[in-house]
A protein has these predicted regions:
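Domain-level signature for soluble enzymes in the chorismate/prephenate branch of the shikimate pathway
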Residues: 2-219
Length: 219
């Protein structure tokens, strides 16, 4: 019967998330040694025993692969899920990659957030920023999309504040910025294609259950 099964395909966000996810899979008995080969040119990796396929993708693309069913399951940061806003089910908080999405700026900008002034907000996450200011705070803002070094925004007076991921806050401190408001907590999540969720309900439920148990026993 095993050979009749189709492969369950996973899209993993490249980098630390993928590494952590694969470690987690190993703990529940799912190995994929090919993926550990640093020199490999392969794009898709297979575990024949459990009929699983894995591929690595850029974080922001993971929800796209999952929405279109090119991957049944994805592992990606909550920031990406919120920003990309794809039609996927979020089934599990994996608990690693913990950080926060925050509004940051110089201390003086705190006042601008209180009085609903029209301010400029720089962010790699324009959708998250828009959702937060327009729908949660009901504050009209101009959102400026940047692709990196967002901390520069307030320093060169491109923006009053930024919306960005904060882990330790040391980069902010070095640049005379601070967390002014917290938008939401973030961590790695497992997402599933809605059709796969129905068609492969048992396999996916078993997998999610096994991972959930494993996460419970971790320190």
């Amino acid at each position: 019967v095993m050979s009749e099964e189709r492969y369950l395909t996973f899209a993993l966000g490249k980098g630390r998330l993928a590494k952590k996810t694969l470690e987690l899979f190993e703990q529940i008995g799912i190995t994929c040694d090919e993926m550990k080969d640093k020199d490999t040119r392969k794009l898709i990796f297979v575990n024949e025993e459990y009929k699983l396929r894995f591929f690595l993708a850029k974080g922001p693309d993971v929800p796209t692969y999952v929405e279109y069913g090119a991957a049944d399951i994805g592992v990606v940061g909550k920031d990406t899920i919120l920003e990309e806003n794809r039609n996927v089910y979020e089934v599990l908080d994996l608990g690693f990659g913990k950080c926060r999405m925050c509004v940051c700026g110089p201390a003086s900008a705190g006042e601008l957030l209180k009085h609903h002034e029209r301010i400029r907000v720089a962010s790699k996450y324009p959708n998250i920023a828009r959702e937060y200011f327009y729908n949660k705070k009901h504050q009209t803002v101009d959102i400026i999309k940047l692709n990196g070094s967002v901390e520069l925004g307030p320093l060169v007076e491109l923006s009053d504040v930024i919306v960005d991921i904060v882990e330790t806050g040391s980069t902010l401190k070095e640049n005379g910025l601070e967390v002014l408001e917290e938008v939401c907590p973030l961590s790695a999540r497992m997402i599933v294609n809605p059709v796969s969720m129905q068609m492969e309900a048992d396999r996916i439920r078993k997998l999610v259950g096994a991972i959930r148990e494993q996460l419970k026993i971790q320190p």
